[in-house]
Design a protein with these regions (language model features):
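Class I S-adenosyl-L-methionine-dependent methyltransferase catalytic core
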Residues: 1-182
């Protein structure tokens, strides 16, 4: 796994050992960032269920202003910190060791892009979306990765689907805040 483009292009990223995480493939990641490439520059990013932190790191490499990485796995947090050190992005990053619900209930910041890639088939996208409205900017985008058997609804908690993509058994849904695709 690597950073695809930007200031950290080609840097290798480590991933947590074991079956607890399922890193986004380079192909899927590249497709996601091609779809949102004009919405990254200067934005504040939240990488929820961050795993290796690769989505937030890719956004930073492409010009995002800052990123917060939230995960409650010690293995994941070690990888995120190592990846941030390797890419020299620590100064524009925050790594938070807490459950996503607790984090979302306490923060006052507003995010412009939120990456959601939780464990599949547990309803966590909807649980997170229910708490994200108040901590996101008016032009926020949610980028949700799920299995194709558990695609979130077209509208959820003030976010409307903008685009959907399918890559084998992976589905990516991009939502915009308060905006339908019509």
């Amino acid at each position: 796994m690597r950073v695809i483009t930007g200031s950290c292009r080609g840097k290798r990223l480590v991933t947590p050992d074991g079956l607890d995480t399922r890193p986004t493939t380079d192909k899927v990641k590249e497709s996601i960032f091609n779809a949102i490439q004009f919405d990254i520059e200067g934005r504040r990013v939240l990488d929820l269920f961050a795993g290796s932190g690769q989505m937030g790191i890719e956004a930073l490499s492409r010009g995002a202003k800052s990123a917060v990485f939230v995960d409650n796995s010690q293995k994941s947090l070690r990888c995120i910190r190592e990846n941030l050190e390797n890419t020299k992005l620590q100064s524009v990053s925050e790594v938070v060791n807490v459950d996503f619900e607790l984090y979302l209930s306490r923060i006052k910041d507003k995010f412009d892009i939120v990456f959601l890639d939780p464990p599949y088939n547990k309803g966590l996208i909807e649980k997170a979306a229910a708490k994200l409205y108040d901590v996101t900017s008016d032009f926020c985008m949610l980028v949700c990765e799920t299995s194709t058997t558990d695609v979130p609804p077209d509208e959820m908690f003030g976010f409307c689907v903008y685009r959907r993509y399918r890559y084998g058994k992976v589905s990516v849904s991009v939502y915009k805040k308060g905006q339908s695709n019509e």
